[in-house]
Amino acid sequence: VRDAAYKYVTDFDVALDIGANVGFWARPLTEKFKQVIAYEPMPQVLECLELNVKDLPVTINKYALGKTESTVDMIYDSVNTGNSHVDEDTFGSGNVTVKKLDDLDVPKFGLIKIDCERHELPILEGAIQTILKHKPIVIVEQHADTEYCAGEFLKSYGAKELTNVRRDYIFGW
């Protein structure tokens, strides 16, 4: 998926990795980008993420992103940490901070990867102004069994689906 996306990227200064987990994306992104900004709220994987990107140009933000600023609980999957996810029923009452990307001072970025186990649409809703400002290549995971479609949301703002690799869709402008 990365290689498919790289063909469309024109700005290799900064990449955003939303749902960084243990660094499966953040680490290889540093081979192409000067700086990677990672977002990962799961305390159970943060130490591994920090070790995997040690001495690399990666900034780790230890909070979740979403549609509104709030708090939420996370459901941890110890068998496959990549399946850990936001507990949608706990917005406003959880112990993990949620911020909107649109409220943050992020530098111009050429690529944004969002893989947050069915929480992609709320993240996009809270990031759309920043995305429209920078018009990066967007990689977003989409599940066929979800009620929403992150891709349709992006298309409603003028994004074009460039290609997909299994459940990962690549959009551009």
Role assignments for model-derived ranges:
Residues 1-173:
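Phosphate/nucleotide-binding beta-alpha loop and adjacent structural elements of enzyme active sites
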